Design a protein with these regions (language model features):
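Flavin-dependent oxidoreductases
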Residues: 48, 286-411, 415-442, 454
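Short beta-strand to alpha-helix junction loop
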Residues: 103-116, 170-171, 236-252, 401, ...
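Dinucleotide-binding Rossmann-like beta1-alpha1 core, especially the glycine-rich loop
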Residues: 93-212
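Helical element adjacent to the flavin cofactor pocket in flavoenzyme catalytic cores
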Residues: 233-279, 284-285, 289-291, 295-296
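Conserved Rossmann-like nucleotide-cofactor binding loop
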Residues: 45, 83, 299
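C-terminal catalytic lobe of FAD-dependent flavoproteins
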Residues: 436-470, 474-563
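Beta1/beta-strand and adjacent pyrophosphate-binding region of the FAD-binding site
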Residues: 29-45
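Glycine-rich FAD pyrophosphate-binding loop
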Residues: 54-89
Length: 563
């Protein structure tokens, strides 16, 4: 039996603590100085960056080549909420695939899919480890976050495929061109995760109408089907599409990072998670960090977070414009709906439904429908200082949780994701019946995301490296002198790397593992802070030459589309 009153054994996985830190068991001596990295944001990008920085350090890639006593790394993640709460990532649809809306393959889509799947599998193992089967009581389990969770949720992610119906005639033309008229298996060399097939209306109806027509007591509305001839004429199916419970994934990813840091404590690795809202880049820059990575979504455009010149630099390097988008999604809950196991037939699982309106069955009994969105103005570099800002609270204000809002979202769901409602014959007349109703709504979720400039190949997240080093004024060595305030201070410049991951948009789940790898590699390349020494002002002039002579650079690590 566990002793719950033992306060000496602190649970490092308790999300209720403000700071969670994993470090070596010995007291660090003064001769060992870690690379100190701050990451602002605990969404897909922020946690992926933290994980990859720690992984690289465990392989010795952050150890200085100039001084053997300067090794190890400390990663501190700052977030206003616990991992899995707040921000766009925590309410992401969780639809993992590597195809554009017209069926073509996204650049770096296959490798992004593979890297994300690898992290998902690790996080699933972490979650399984943290569930104590002896504590299962009446369908609930006690998990690492200290909360009671429903066992019926199933696994964190499921490979059920993703279906993209054509919703317009233009969609149908593009899908036929990219999928039907392309021999995807011409040489029999297509990788399993790349498999895609063209589907006709009949197969789409099997997936979209199967449950609605079972036990609903009515025939389909023929007139409604005629109206949907174009919308449901064809589509494509991504064989290895995955639906992910984004909130659970983020929770487990944070614990995976803690495990990784603890496992590599001998390499002088430590990790801290601080529940704290960072008000500005300057606030963090004035602390003792050697590198700063901003992965804070729309917060980066909040008034005062960046100074005007840095904000202009962000816009220019991110492609010229950024757009904030506030939105809401319905979280649906319904038994025996998204997964069915009938005695007479095999198990059936609804695939993820792609499109401008999506449906993601992220648990056995839960799905997310969305997004209903409101785009902010596209902001150009010259207007960067006046950039508008959407917070989650602003999204809630724009889209209040009212009966009118719920009714609107239900109409969108029943009309745009599902074909027209069934018609039920009553004794007096025909009565329309929608598949989903207000009783199926669990909650309304809100979020804000940042979109970048659209290119012919689509939108891509951006990794921005800022140019300006941080200047600090150190105390005089003679501060102990009675007249120390009259003595000249030593002004020096600590060259800090500041990176920002922005414009993640709707591609966070697909690309976040790759983004984390690139950010970690960028922190290693041109290791200006490798020896952690204070650099004299005049030495900063030589930084450009040092970068030009480096074998690896930010430009060679991060592909052009992502910078």
């Amino acid at each position: 039996m566990r002793n719950n009153n033992n306060n000496n054994n602190k649970n490092v996985f308790d999300e209720s603590s403000t700071t969670t830190e994993t470090s070596s068991n010995y007291e660090e001596d003064n001769e060992r100085k870690k690379l100190n990295v701050a990451i602002v944001g605990a969404g897909f990008a922020g946690l992926s960056c933290a994980y990859n920085v720690i992984r690289r350090c465990s392989r010795g890639e952050f150890i200085s080549s100039t001084k053997s006593n300067n090794d190890g790394v400390n990663v501190t993640v700052f977030a206003a909420e616990h991992a899995g709460q707040g921000g766009a990532s925590s309410i992401a649809a969780g639809l993992l695939h590597q195809r554009t809306p017209k069926g073509s393959k996204m650049p770096y889509g296959s490798v992004g899919y593979a890297k994300t799947l690898e992290m998902l599998e690790k996080c699933q193992k972490i979650e399984d480890m943290m569930v104590d089967p002896d504590l299962n009581v009446s369908g609930i389990d006690f998990r690492f976050s200290g909360e009671l969770r429903d066992v019926k949720r199933g696994k964190m992610f499921r490979k059920v495929g993703c279906l993209k119906p054509a919703r317009t005639e233009k969609d149908a033309i593009g899908i036929r061109k990219n999928v039907l008229n392309t021999d995807n298996n011409a040489n029999g060399e297509e990788k399993e995760e790349d498999a895609i097939r063209f589907v006709e209306r009949e197969e789409i109806e099997v997936d979209l109408l199967r449950l609605r027509n079972k036990g609903e007591g009515g025939d389909e509305d023929e007139d409604a089907n005629k109206e949907n001839n174009i919308n449901n004429a064809c589509g494509f199916f991504v064989e290895n599409g995955i639906v992910v419970d984004a909130q659970r994934y983020l929770e487990a990813l944070k614990v995976l990072i803690e495990f990784e840091a603890a496992k590599n404590a001998h390499a002088n690795v430590s990790f801290a998670f601080k529940k704290r809202r960072v008000e500005s880049l300057e606030e963090i820059a004035n602390e003792s960090f050697d590198a700063i990575v901003l992965c804070c979504g729309g917060e980066i455009l909040r008034d005062g977070f960046l100074d005007d010149s840095t904000k202009r630099e962000l816009f220019e390097k991110a492609g010229g414009t950024l757009e904030l988008q506030a939105g809401r999604a319905l979280v649906l809950e319904r038994e025996n709906c998204f997964v069915r196991e009938d005695e007479e037939e095999k198990k059936w699982e609804m695939p993820g439904i792609l499109g401008s309106h999506y449906l993601s069955p992220f648990q056995k009994t839960k799905a997310m429908f969305g997004p209903t969105k409101e785009r902010g103005e596209k902001v150009k570099p010259g207007d960067a200082a006046k950039a508008g800002y959407y917070s989650t609270e602003a999204a809630k204000t724009s889209f209040p949780n009212t009966p009118e809002t719920i009714d609107f979202l239900l109409r969108e769901l029943n009309e745009k994701v599902y074909p027209k409602a069934t018609t039920i014959q009553t004794t007096t007349s025909k009565k329309k019946k929608n598949f989903f109703s207000i009783k199926d709504i669990d909650t309304v979720a809100y979020g804000v995301r940042v979109n970048g400039t659209r290119t012919p190949a689509g939108r891509f997240p951006k990794i921005v490296q800022f140019d300006t080093p941080t200047t600090t004024t150190n105390k005089s060595d003679q501060d102990h002198h009675p007249r120390s305030r009259f003595l000249p201070k030593k002004t020096s410049t600590t060259v800090k790397k500041v990176l920002a991951v922005t414009a993640v948009g709707a591609r966070g789940l697909l690309y976040h593992a790759l983004l984390g790898e690139w950010v970690a590699a960028a922190l290693v390349c041109n290791n200006d802070f490798g020896n952690h020494a204070v650099v004299n002002v005049e030495d900063v002039k030589n930084e450009k030459n040092k970068k030009d002579n480096a074998k690896e650079s930010f430009e060679t690590i991060v592909p052009e589309a992502f910078r």
